Amino acid sequence: MTQTFADQKRKTVETAEFTEDGRYKRKVRSFVLRTGRLSEFQRNMMNDNWGTLGLDYQTEPFDFAKIYGNDNPVVLEIGFGMGKSLVDMAFANPDKNYLGIEVHTPGVGACIAYAVEKGVTNLRVICHDATEILRDSIADGALGGLQLFFPDPWHKAKHHKRRIVQPHFVTQVIQKLGENGFIHMATDWENYAEQMLEVLSANTDLVNTSKNGDYIPRPDFRPLTKFEARGYKLGHGVWDLYFVKK
């Protein structure tokens, strides 16, 4: 019998189906993912390919060697949007494994569809809260790197505390990084870039790779997104930060 989404590993999963409004149900914990209507195509792609491209939240660490079938380094990307740049990176770097987390279900569906189109096999995606995945599902030292590109800036000052880049988050990520693991962030909000730089620089377990001690030019290996290209044409800035674990 062909297994569909989330119907393969966890006894706590109640259903394998995504509904049209993006609701995802579990026996133990139910939550409504970020709003967004799944197209029939996206829902079918998720259900048909989740057994090979999807992972479910679990309370014990993932066995990445078993999941990917090799010992290549695992790069985690949090908040991959529609997933095009993540899939492109996985396609361009077959010597690395990629793990993407996104709570916007249409984005997950689009990412899976594009991965299938490109024939990518070194990518897995998760539809769950990133902090819980880091806490429960990833072993200490298991990651080769973390990518966080254009996270929600929460631009109002009173909402800055909601930004994902906080000292405790960085400490948690560092714990999951292996030796010489990296943290690569990018944002088009200068104020958020300054906060990222401040938080990362304050952690004594990290080294900034920038020659000037601040930002780096966009590296060639980070694909230029349509959103980013449009921003450049409008004169918007983009700031990349790349730190390495000591």
Swiss-Prot record:
Binding locations of S-adenosyl-L-methionine: 77, 102, 129, 152
Annotated GO biological process: RNA (guanine-N7)-methylation; tRNA methylation
Residues given in the record as substrate binding sites: 156, 188, 225-228
Keyword S-adenosyl-L-methionine applies: yes
Gene Ontology MF term list: tRNA (guanine(46)-N7)-methyltransferase activity
Keywords in alphabetical order: Methyltransferase, S-adenosyl-L-methionine, Transferase, tRNA processing
EC number in record: 2.1.1.33
Listed GO CC annotations: tRNA methyltransferase complex
Main EC class the enzyme belongs to: transferase
Catalytic activity: guanosine(46) in tRNA + S-adenosyl-L-methionine = N(7)-methylguanosine(46) in tRNA + S-adenosyl-L-homocysteine
Catalytic residue list: 152
Highest taxon, organism lineage: Bacteria
Pathway membership, UniProt: tRNA modification; N(7)-methylguanine-tRNA biosynthesis
Biological role: Catalyzes the formation of N(7)-methylguanine at position 46 (m7G46) in tRNA.
Record family assignment: Belongs to the class I-like SAM-binding methyltransferase superfamily. TrmB family.
Protein name per the record: tRNA (guanine-N(7)-)-methyltransferase
Species in which this protein is naturally found: Haemophilus influenzae (strain ATCC 51907 / DSM 11121 / KW20 / Rd)
